[in-house]
């Protein structure tokens, strides 16, 4: 049956009433569920996890930015990494030079050698996210090669389609390239995102095949929310929702106790994100264009990264 007018409004109000009073509670409930019901599984890193398959959360971007508050999230890292992706860079040292060392372990000499990439320079991650976003299908040589005009620029294609055909159901960017997987230091965890335009708002849904709930997921939520803000800004839209779909949602066994501490904390209001100048193209964004206002998180909780 077609739902129109007041019926549609009633449905929207019901959905709103069912949503938690604070978006962060969705994340905390996911963590609680995994701790309570997760299956114990071995994993690539040898650390061990509690895991469930299939979770989803919806974060409003309309008047707030979902930077979690029950612990401090590394905002500088979120911003610098996303700009690094947008550049198409696959050089971990480039990011590290800006004080963001989240890719250092995967680009280390020992790690690359363990994967059989002995001929590759240290820091060369292979055709990971940025390469797939901007040069999908091009032949990867090394992190220093110039790939201008090679492959499919998925990110620009997303932006162009939003501008010219916003009702298109194919506004998709995919980092999962089976041909290139053997060349990557780490295959994509956040594999595919789709954009959706309605009533002047831009929403994004991410499919994340693998979600490290302690360290990775808070970072990923903020990263794709930021990407949505950036694309909305360029295309003259307002940010709508970020829908986060998880495949294997897991908690590393050495993160259980830190996450129990986090669960005891009450979420504080999400901050706001301001873009400080008019930016015309996705490649023109700079670190200084963004300002987070009203971010008052609980203290940092230390968790070790599984490599």
UniProtKB/Swiss-Prot annotation:
Top-level enzyme category: transferase
Pathway assigned to this chain's UniProt record: Pyrimidine metabolism; dTTP biosynthesis
An MF annotation (GO) of this entry: sequence-specific mRNA binding
Signal peptide from the UniProt entry: none
Active site positions: 189
InterPro entries noted in UniProt: Thymidate_synth/dCMP_Mease, Thymidate_synth/dCMP_Mease_dom, Thymidate_synth/dCMP_Mease_sf, Thymidylate_synthase, Thymidylate_synthase_AS
Chief location: nucleus
Keywords, ordered alphabetically: Cytoplasm, Isopeptide bond, Membrane, Methyltransferase, Mitochondrion, Mitochondrion inner membrane, Nucleotide biosynthesis, Nucleus, Phosphoprotein, Transferase, Ubl conjugation
Compartments (UniProt record): Nucleus; Cytoplasm; Mitochondrion; Mitochondrion matrix
Catalytic activity: dUMP + (6R)-5,10-methylene-5,6,7,8-tetrahydrofolate = 7,8-dihydrofolate + dTMP
SUBUNIT field: Homodimer.
Database matches in NCBIfam families: PRK01827.1-3, thym_sym
Annotated protein name in UniProt: Thymidylate synthase
